[in-house]
């Protein structure tokens, strides 16, 4: 006989259809819309069973939170006697979220979630237990900060300090690799392992870049262009310096009185004779200190010195000793005035190149 009233009977654990076993395992309780129960003719037995079922439900409520009943989800009206089941305070809002509260029997999905959470907490605790790594990162960051626009260790650190810091960075990288292997063995999922590995690799790259920048600031290198230009400039100044050195040797070999007396006539000749002006302009002006002057002269350099001597030498009469009243300077100027027409009358032989044009032959065709 099927009941017309919307009432269902709750049976004991281990009953015929095992409704309470499903309830203990966290399944949705079948409501009135799912099944109809056969109600026995003896109403007294039904009421006793119903009361015992209520007591068992209260015991289960204390152990773990229950899900919503199907009758509550559907919004159907319940019988007056079922109001205690409908107004349970321990019912959860989400029928798919089960939070185990110490029950010994759990489904495998919940066990996996619990294990994942425990392993993540262990990883976080391990990361907090390594403050030495963060303490070592502090001085590396402070080294790269400039003071008033100038790096702290620019030109002041020695190579030994740089080597020790490099060794410390390599040791730290080894420690990071060990941590990475330990974290990979502890993390539950492949995605979390990949993220942890990526973070460790990025941290290691940052440390290596900081060490590289630190070494660059400690050992400033010269410009390659300056290194190339320096020997070229020194080689270009060598011949002029040699000529200047030979001229100084010539002036030292002369008598001191003759050198003093010949200084004014040479100046006068340079001013009066225009042919000597280009030679004076072409004289070298680069002078090196005596420590840098070349000492070894080749045969070709000696020949050049002799040619320069012949070019610079000018015929002049022997000067008399200079009297103290300064009349010698007047005599030198007179000699210069007498000597100037002789210089103008001298003819220098300059070979000229004459290009002969070939005569065009008229050919009759």
Curated annotation (Swiss-Prot):
This is Uncharacterized protein C8orf58 homolog. InterPro entries: DUF4657. Residues 239-257, 331-341 have a biased composition (Basic and acidic residues). Pfam families: DUF4657 (PF15552). Residues 218-262, 315-342 are annotated as: Disordered. Transmembrane segments: none annotated. PANTHER family: SIMILAR TO 9930012K11RIK PROTEIN.
